[in-house]
Amino acid sequence: MNWLGAFLTVVSSYICGIMLANGENERLCIIDSLLRLFTYMHRRISAERLPLYRIFVEFSDEYLERIGFLERVRSSRHGLENVWQSAVKLLPTDREVLDELVRFGESLGILPLDEQIKRIEVTCIFLNEKRAKISGALQQKRKSIKSVCLLMGIAIAIILL
């Protein structure tokens, strides 16, 4: 019976490690959603010269909808830079990404279309670099989290035996 308890302790610790490791994917999910938004904005502004509020109304992303980001930016047709700033605060991401999004929002809707397109491109480049950096470290971090949880489970099982 003790061995069964030890085995269950190790397995449950490993499962907890898997769940924690999967939680690390959220950082990458945020960047992917923002990249989709900026790519969509770039395409629609470049090709069709659509106003920003229409772009936000027509864009859909499950993650950005769930955290309330898109609802916030859709809430106003005027003063998008202020609405953008409050929507950016909803994003659970690191300071570097938030600062870049705030800088983008300061000129949102104010710049001429050509300059706005260039600003979107700069932000896309930043997000792509950030995504590459995160995804490169993510696999190793996930593997480490699972290993540490497994070792903790083994240590607990040994102590209990």
Region spans (language model):
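Bilayer-spanning, highly hydrophobic alpha-helical transmembrane segments
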Residues: 5-16, 135-161
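Membrane-anchoring/interfacial helices and their immediately flanking loops
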Residues: 70-95, 157-160
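Membrane-interface, cytosolic juxtamembrane amphipathic helix immediately N-terminal to a transmembrane helix
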Residues: 109-151
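Acidic, low-complexity proline/glycine-rich segments
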Residues: 1-6, 91-94
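Short, non-transmembrane cytosolic segments of multipass membrane proteins
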Residues: 84-114
